[in-house]
């Protein structure tokens, strides 16, 4: 029933507000966890089919996403922690489930020139800048609001990135919306405006394992990427500027292919990963969300399909997971036990004029949509 509010007391929360509408529920919680003295909010979206997403105000992190297999058995398919404090531990985890900004992916040597001025950013992935810097959007507190709409139940994350934050020019107003629908869609909407020209490239850094987090590696997952070309990288994982054909290479995922089938081939680009950590140039015809990728776990039948308005997709095969982190299952996250599919503009675009521009101008808005659809068969 639209607009029905329920107040509940819980052991892990100071307050819970739940809204129920059209078979969907959205629950916002103030947890007992704090970051730098500030409480962490948590939101849960659930659809009529039982799919359930949980996210927190720190980094907009998706901490849990439970989807069914072909037999109707649910599993949490995203890597993460039970204890929220682990998300802001020192050293920090590798961007599990977080909103990435102001610029997702790498900027060469932490520098770019805009309007005749050179801006210097943190080289937090030496010698380059990665995912917005030392304290990017993944390490910031966001304000969460909730709403019901014709599309579904939504959690809306907002924050103001001040002028000069992590070296970027301009005050950026940012809104990221997670919407769960009864069609088993997770819709990711990104919106931003600025008062000065600035690079913007927002994405989401969930690590997927469709067999269930903690279940082992993802090498048997079958991946399809709708791309005829990719952007080769140098030894520091910065694009060379070339748009190379995937034909005859381990980067050809135009047909469903097991991730492990070619990942260790004697290929110069794979050695630089080591493994997959590259941007694919998506085949696009229009301006709306178009098919980008499909990921399937043959054993469980769980499948996700991605459509996006973005021109690129970064496929990262979890090469640097090393077993040092223990996940929700109580099992260590070893190498390649999760993978990322990050919809995006291309890496290092501010320094590569032949790539689609990522410069947002005052008076314009940054708007991007990615739709992740879950199924099992």
Indicate residue ranges for each PLM-predicted region.
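Bacterial N-terminal signal peptides
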Residues: 11-21
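An exposed, glycine/acidic-rich loop-and-rim segment of catalytic or binding clefts
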Residues: 24-377
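Bacterial N-terminal signal peptides that target proteins for export
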Residues: 1-12
